From Swiss-Prot:
GO terms for molecular function: rRNA binding; structural constituent of ribosome. Part of the 30S ribosomal subunit. Interacts with proteins S7 and S18. Binds to IF-3. GO terms for biological process: translation. NCBIfam families: PRK05309.1, uS11_bact. This is Small ribosomal subunit protein uS11. GO terms for cellular component: ribonucleoprotein complex; ribosome. Pfam families: Ribosomal_S11. Keywords: Ribonucleoprotein, Ribosomal protein, RNA-binding, rRNA-binding.
Length: 129
């Protein structure tokens, strides 16, 4: 019996004028997710998805390339203004933000939403080099 050809679901173009850019900058990677106001994902990218491997993922340049990619995908959906939520201690925080502004988005607000414990879990042991 012949297999029925599976149809590739074409990504429909959403017309969304404003959204939220979530920048998650960890020590190992930087992930950028652009959502609408309700939190539905419009586009995403990360340093690892851009082809950077190992310690190169944690560089500011990798974060910049990932932010440019996510911004380009979001612009295809008609997005023009962004609120930015930055989370995490990584080195790609500022460069990702700068790349989003350089991509032509109007950044209306920047929030740091890094979770800070009120003396919660015991931290991992200190690294001695």
């Amino acid at each position: 019996m012949a297999k029925e050809a599976t149809r590739v679901k074409r990504r429909e173009r959403k017309n969304i004028a404003s959204g939220v850019a979530h920048v998650n900058a960890s020590f190992n990677n930087t992930m950028i997710t652009i959502t609408d106001a309700q939190g539905n994902t419009i586009s995403w990218s990360s340093a690892g998805a851009m082809g950077f491997k190992g310690s190169r993922k944690s560089t500011p340049y990798a974060a910049q390339v990932a932010a440019e990619d996510a911004a380009r995908k979001a612009a295809e959906h008609g997005m023009r203004t962004l609120e930015v939520e930055v989370s995490g201690p990584g080195s790609g925080r500022e460069s990702a933000l700068r790349a989003l502004q350089a991509a032509g988005f109007l950044v209306t607000s920047i929030r740091d939403v890094t979770p800070i414990p009120h003396n919660g879990c015991r931290p991992r042991k200190r690294r001695r080099v």
